[in-house]
Amino acid sequence: MSELPIVSIVTFLPLVGAALLLCVDRRREAAIKHLAFGVSAVTFLVSLGLYGNFQLDVPGMQFSERALWITWLGAEYHVGVDGISLLLVLLTTFLTAVAILSSYAAVTTAVKEYMVCLLLLETGMLGVFVALDLVLFYVFWEGMLIPMYFLIGIWGGPRRIYATIKFFLYTMAGGVLMLVGIIALYFLSGGRPGGEYTFDLLKLSALDLPFQAQAWLFLAFAVAFAIKVPMFPFHTWLPDAHVEAPTAGSVILAGVLLKMGTYGFLRFALPLFPDATRYFTPLVSWLAIVGILYGALVSMVQPDLKKLVAYSSVSHLGFVMLGIFALTVQGVEGAILQMINHGLSTGALFLLVGMLYERRHTRMIQDFGGLARIVPIFTAAFLIVTLSSIGLPGLNGFVGEFLILVGTFRVNVLYAALATAGIILAAVYMLWMFQRVMFGPVTQEANRGLVDLTAREMAVLAPVLALIVLIGIYPQPFLRTTEASVAQLLARVQERKELRAESREIRAESRERRVQGREPRAANWTWHANETEGEGRDGR
């Protein structure tokens, strides 16, 4: 299998499926649904083959494929995976299949176009995670906006147009900044003695850029990624998009699309701009903490189930960002695992809320109560996912959050303490929500006639719940997958720190000699002086 272009097969198989769907008569809705699910299921199985042939001890890119694309520009079709991107590829293929299966009963209009959009979206998301050329990455990054735009704008709720335009404008604004950064990086790579104009990520990672360039480029990329995460204060598009999106759109949005932002920091910000990363670490960490606490507090007062889950994502992804910028092995590995955990837990929450909405056509918490007596299987599934979301030991949420807190505690006790408060608040708003929906008297007569989960709905939820329990009990295979890649990533950042420290020592000795009159004054030290600013404010 390693001789096959397996990464390309996984990436473009959904695109082929979308093309096949276009050939099917729109009146054959059952055939369209089965074909879409079949393509997504096969894509997931092929991605499992990718995992089965992955060498865990190899830190670099594997299954790399390279071909000339835009020769005169230096852009290539270059794809591959490492331990970080592999897990996200698996998450994408898994959740897309789940989302399509969950849409069988929920979508009744323009079914053909809906399934085409989901498959096109899958190819766009997979392309983001496997692209190793910046132009190719940007094409996938912006390309996935189009199907998501239509998913929310056509099949969304009453305020779908407002939510769609807001989502599109926010993401496009960040994309423009990133495009400027990509172009600047391209000219910096070739505009130096012996340089080569390139968009290749691996070649660009080897550049030794001055701190000023790193700082500006980091900001250009970071804003684009922070909008996608979304980090506070770039989060305002998310609740509207979630509330108006169809169930499958919310599952994909929360489960995968938001991870594109955190993945961007790991894949681009840290290796390309290590000095700027260290310098901006305190700022990003504080924004992450504000997001953790703000998201939790706002979730507590939400009357809408979907909006509550949406704001909880702001809080959970604040933990991911805090772990990444702890720049420790535990922090980064915990952040990657928590990306997977959040995709499963929050995706499952949106599935359950969607199933409830299909029965009652309302998401208001006040419209429920006492459901545990009426739909016990649904209640049990909801309980497992709720406990997972608050990080109960034995379920997946605990492992990631624990590693993030350990990694953060090693570098800043205050950060870890404030983040811990976010976990307590998460337990408050999630358990309070569960209590109001599932317990107490049945106050609405419409709730008495609710039916429990169907066989199809149980088939949708069962694999997600199984993974939630599996990761909580035995997370080692997932951590082992990312171990070598995380070590290589942090070694790059640490190497740059040591080089800067050595450079400062040499300059200090040189200045001392000049003061003592033993060495002539150098012509210009402006660049080196600015370099010293690259060290983080907290000394990391």
Predicted regions and their residues:
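Transmembrane helix-loop-helix hairpins at membrane boundaries of multipass inner-membrane proteins
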Residues: 1-6, 20-116, 192-208
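Low-complexity, proline/glycine-enriched hydrophobic segments characteristic of transmembrane helices
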Residues: 477-540
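Alpha-helical multi-pass transmembrane bundles of energy-transducing inner-membrane proteins
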Residues: 27-30, 113-120, 124-213, 298-311, ...
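Predominantly late transmembrane helices and immediately cytosolic-facing juxtamembrane segments
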Residues: 232, 346-349, 417-449
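Juxtamembrane/interfacial segments at transmembrane-helix boundaries in multi-pass membrane proteins
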Residues: 54-76, 176-235, 240, 265-283, ...
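C-terminal ends of transmembrane helices
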Residues: 18-29, 96-108, 150-159, 229-243, ...
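Structural signature of hydrophobic alpha-helical transmembrane segments
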Residues: 2-13, 81-92, 134-147, 214-225, ...
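Central hydrophobic cores of alpha-helical transmembrane segments in multi-pass inner-membrane proteins
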Residues: 8-23, 37-52, 89-103, 121-123, ...
